[in-house]
Amino acid sequence: MPLRPTPPALPFEYPAHLRAQAEAAPRAPGVYFFYAQGDSMPLYIGKSVDIRSRLLAHLRTPEEARMLRQAQRIEYQQTAGEIGALLLESRLIKELQPLKNKRLRRQRRLCSLRMHQDKLEIIDTTALAEGPQLYGLFRSRRMAIEALMLLADEHRLCHSLLGIEPANTKGCFRAQIRKCAGACRGDETHAAHTERLLQALAHWAVHRWPYPAAIALHERHGQMEQYHVVDNWRYIGTYASEAEARLAPTLPPQSFDADSYKILVRPVLFESARVVVLS
């Protein structure tokens, strides 16, 4: 039976009242907001290194077209660079929960994996501390176990040695069907299994904080400057001057946030922005 031809997409033009607002936006980094008529809460929050260009490009999918039909006004907030835009967007989406954005919520609990006395453990990592290397940032213990099971399948690791299921002196069922290399029944030494496990976990390693104190990541766009203060991967806040950044408050260890870590890890490790050590 021949396939039905796909109907042509209906033409859609950028609403005139929104186009005028978009064209008036700056060609600068920052965060922008779409609002429906009469609403004080945004429909959608986005970010870009060029607010105007990104606003005018919001016609790429049917979902974006539908959102533009609902929107009545656009607002924006400039930042001094991409890092500031990413941090601001992440914070505002968590706080405001816009209808058209993927839901982001601050995680009150995070889990990671670590090796302790030759055993793999799942621990709470809402607060990062000095100690053994941590692997992965998971939103629940269940998600950590699911990820570990996929890793076990890929590398023929033993569920019992990973702590996923009880040990069996005769070896696990997965060893019988050759999904486990057999460390549970003597086909492989425990040391060899641990070495393979650590190699498999390496790409999940949580980077250690590389500075002796808090730092500020400095960004500038035109006359605008911002200093993003970070301490042990915890985002403290954004300030307009280095002097203000040096007066930034400290935060409790429980303020660690996985989304901020993912935003900050590259600029901190590779210094894509100027780093000021706040000792």
What are these regions (language model features)?
Residues M1-L43, K47-S279:
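Conserved catalytic/ligand-binding micro-motifs in nucleotide and anionic cofactor chemistry
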